Amino acid sequence: MLSSRNWVGQKVPFHASAAGKVLLAFNVAQVPSGKLEKLTNSTIINKNDLETELEKVRRAGYAVIIDELEPGLVAVSVPVVNESGLVVAALSVSGPAARLNQSRINELIKLLKNEVSKVALPNSIRTNRKKGAA
């Protein structure tokens, strides 16, 4: 049986979500000043480790989480940019780890990058940096 927490209307910590990591990596959001909440045994709670992870996200152009937000959940996210190339949002897909192996994750990264390449957001779309949670 597959189950997942209903995140609709809930605050999702940036450091534990794929979209949050994209937003942190590209300075759309700020790492919270306090302690990072541990949601699972895989959640990154050390800020130095998080910065290392965010550097990987910047270099790769996408984020992947496995078991960081909740056990058995995998998520992939890519940045969405405006006409000037400024990251203003993130596009994500998530699902159960049993269905999202590494091959499928790689496929989703390509699909997401392809979809965001079709989006032409005007420069009038900007972001207000947020701390902590989406």
Residue ranges of predicted features:
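Amphipathic alpha-helical effector-binding/dimerization core
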Residues: M1-K35
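Nucleotide phosphate-binding site architecture
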Residues: L24, V81, S94
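C-terminal regulatory
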Residues: A29-V76
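Juxtadomain coupling helices with adjacent low-complexity linkers
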Residues: K47-D49, E53, A60, P71-G72, ...
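A short, hydrophobic, proline-anchored segment that marks a local hinge/packing element in signaling
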Residues: V76-E83
